[in-house]
Amino acid sequence: MADCVIRDWQGKEAGKATLDLKVAKETTANDLMHRAVLRQQAHARQGTASTLTRSEVRGGGRKPYKQKGTGRARQGSIRTPLRPGGGIVFGPKPRTYNLAMNRKERRLALRTALMARVEDVTVVKDFGTSLEAPKTKEITDALGRLGIAADAKVLIVLTEPSDVVRRSVRNLEKVKLIAANQLNVFDLLHANALVLGEDALATIQEVYGDD
């Protein structure tokens, strides 16, 4: 269980919230989160890289020159891997990089990652609701008021990010905005600072706090 300070859009304290999630044992936590990150990165790979073997390359059916009498090494095809334009030996073929991890482990890894970063969490009440039009400076100023460094990698988690907030954030290279139902281990561990909307915190507690 961890207590989080709730701040308003101006960075002033506006209350407190509690995050109570079941986490993995200390002896297995690092391994569990590591496997979850590996799985997420592996699933992001397309696995479509493909090369042609000597049997698949077009041409090469005719013997390039006679077997004997030329003084050169014997050759049976111009598509041998020894020649330019020939087939590839042991090259990549389409494959799946998917790694298996059951649902219970995935949820436990996510809860463990979030609780491990709880000291870097800032809960904000009504994040961005006062924005009338997309304005990047409003977001950077708000993050500054929350005490987040300008060069920090920031993950903002909202229940239903508005279009205004999305457009205000998209030009910030080190700021990533995701919905609460898109929460993942990699983003939680990769960011230097986590900004959660008050409603997003409630959603996370509701969805992941029942195990």
UniProtKB/Swiss-Prot annotation:
<keyword id="KW-0699">rRNA-binding</keyword>
<dbReference type="InterPro" id="IPR013005">
    <property type="entry name" value="Ribosomal_uL4-like"/>
</dbReference>
<feature type="region of interest" description="Disordered">
    <location>
        <begin position="41"/>
        <end position="87"/>
    </location>
</feature>
<comment type="similarity">
    <text>Belongs to the universal ribosomal protein uL4 family.</text>
</comment>
<comment type="function">
    <text>Forms part of the polypeptide exit tunnel.</text>
</comment>
<dbReference type="InterPro" id="IPR002136">
    <property type="entry name" value="Ribosomal_uL4"/>
</dbReference>
<comment type="function">
    <text>One of the primary rRNA binding proteins, this protein initially binds near the 5'-end of the 23S rRNA. It is important during the early stages of 50S assembly. It makes multiple contacts with different domains of the 23S rRNA in the assembled 50S subunit and ribosome.</text>
</comment>
<keyword id="KW-0687">Ribonucleoprotein</keyword>
<dbReference type="GO" id="GO:0003735">
    <property type="term" value="F:structural constituent of ribosome"/>
</dbReference>
<dbReference type="GO" id="GO:0019843">
    <property type="term" value="F:rRNA binding"/>
</dbReference>
<keyword id="KW-0689">Ribosomal protein</keyword>
<dbReference type="GO" id="GO:0006412">
    <property type="term" value="P:translation"/>
</dbReference>
<dbReference type="GO" id="GO:1990904">
    <property type="term" value="C:ribonucleoprotein complex"/>
</dbReference>
<feature type="compositionally biased region" description="Basic residues">
    <location>
        <begin position="60"/>
        <end position="71"/>
    </location>
</feature>
<dbReference type="InterPro" id="IPR023574">
    <property type="entry name" value="Ribosomal_uL4_dom_sf"/>
</dbReference>
<dbReference type="GO" id="GO:0005840">
    <property type="term" value="C:ribosome"/>
</dbReference>
<keyword id="KW-0694">RNA-binding</keyword>
<protein>
    <recommendedName>
        <fullName>Large ribosomal subunit protein uL4</fullName>
    </recommendedName>
</protein>
<comment type="subunit">
    <text>Part of the 50S ribosomal subunit.</text>
</comment>
<dbReference type="Pfam" id="PF00573">
    <property type="entry name" value="Ribosomal_L4"/>
</dbReference>
